[in-house]
């Protein structure tokens, strides 16, 4: 049976677990008898191996398994009897002094902390707001037009003109070039190409290369020096100066589609109505703005909660979360196609600060939800699923997809709980509204 629970620190505890030897031995005997029915030993048929021989060969292994099971069961019983909220897994060590009739082990573990959340009225939150008008719609249309850009040979007449009298390469043109690069008069890997296309001004090439191509006409060439940056991805040439010769093969000027009925149809407006197109773009932008403002204000609320909360964080939970973050990082590498990603040597220490924040925040949120009844209701979950599904072509299929998988539904439930917490805190905290542009909102949410 358990002795008195000892306090070893703020959260660390120790308790003695005692297991009667006769109880342990009975379980060992029972398992060996069961094992004897299936164990295979050369010279004996299955089930015919003498019990004594099975015991001699497997007693140590079986004893270790029985002790492990019994210790775990007894610790669970003790923790419930003592109302211990155990955080993480306990460690067990045999006591130096053992009784004749019992095995004794010290169980060392951590308990969940007491969470003290300060007065929410003292929490300060800055809430970003934005409005969607014609300027935001026009900027979005510009982006959509650029995504549908097509090119025409500069100087050649076509349905959209010839691109102007000046046939030299300009920023925005798509050019096709041959180039040869050498370092100390020796060609290097990746330094030579034929019929290589790129768009001037997009920054795909190094600045010196783009500058050299600007102003060239078809058939012209230019020789220039280019110093590779010290941190260039090609280690063999990083920090070195190469001499390039570039020859212009083709110059194509960009033509953006007109904003007309055909353009609207390409965006899914079946009748090509431009008013409907702008209304749909506005609706999508408002939905995106809402999502981004919610994300930013959620982070603001979480930061505010951490500032007014007091608690100690169990090391065991931090270590567990570090391992989760390591596995998430490996999965991300695997999705990017990195070879042997599942065995990537990612040190858990690099996630220590992030894990501590996540665990601390989880404990604070759990306390706030429990104390104020902020659990997610089924109708709230369904409303969020429906809202999310609106942005897809077949909303009903998206709803079915969510409700067919418990993990996805659990993720949405967690989102709803967080939203409940945010709304609850905003209703009590000092909230300052700040109007920001949609572009600033996008930038802020990307950094959050």
UniProtKB/Swiss-Prot annotation:
Give the signal peptide as a residue range, or say none if absent: none
> What parts of the sequence cross the membrane?
none
A single Gene Ontology MF term assigned here is: peptidyl-prolyl cis-trans isomerase activity
Query: Is the keyword Cytoplasm in the record?
Result: yes
Q: Which UniProt keywords apply?
A: Cell cycle, Cell division, Chaperone, Cytoplasm, Isomerase, Rotamase
At the top of the EC hierarchy, this enzyme's class is isomerase
Instruction: Name the SUPFAM superfamilies for this protein.
Output: FKBP-like, Triger factor/SurA peptide-binding domain-like, Trigger factor ribosome-binding domain
Which superkingdom? Answer: Bacteria
Q: Which InterPro entries match?
A: PPIase_dom_sf, PPIase_FKBP_dom, Trig_fac, Trigger_fac_C, Trigger_fac_C_sf, Trigger_fac_ribosome-bd_bac, Trigger_fac_ribosome-bd_sf, Trigger_fact/SurA_dom_sf
Q: Which GO terms describe its cellular component?
A: cytoplasm
**Main function:** Involved in protein export. Acts as a chaperone by maintaining the newly synthesized protein in an open conformation. Functions as a peptidyl-prolyl cis-trans isomerase.
The record's family statement is: Belongs to the FKBP-type PPIase family. Tig subfamily.
**UniProt note: domains:** Consists of 3 domains; the N-terminus binds the ribosome, the middle domain has PPIase activity, while the C-terminus has intrinsic chaperone activity on its own.
Q: What's the protein name?
A: Trigger factor
